[in-house]
Amino acid sequence: MPLPSKPKKVHTLIEDIHHLLQHGKEELDQDNLKEFLSVMKEEVERFLQPYEGERKRLRLSAVGRTDRKLWYEINDPIPRKETPQLRMRFFYGHILEALLLYLATEAGHKVEHKQAEVVIEGIKGHIDAVIDGVLVD
């Protein structure tokens, strides 16, 4: 059963993905599938590389934290190591994000600027994506 021919807007995203999962799709977008598999390969390779410790730097994702918290995150005198459980949790999150962006595209939504780097007032960060013209992060 094809997806309903409603205009694709971000507010129909979940409904459209559910429809795709329930009814399937006759032909998959092969370019989208190749991109998804490429992202999966990169994530597995990054996950299984030797862990070099966290890089301490100011990122856009930290906006909103107190100055004191930011100072301690960057200047913490106690060395912290990511546990295997925490690394697994981040890996799972990366895989889930890639899967959902893949499904959004297969459901007919326009997905752009995946993991695009942005710089605001000299601070670097990445956006997850823009779906149907709406920043999704």
Question: Which residues fall in each region the model found?
Answer:
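Metal-dependent nuclease catalytic cores that hydrolyze phosphodiester bonds in DNA/RNA
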Residues: 1-135
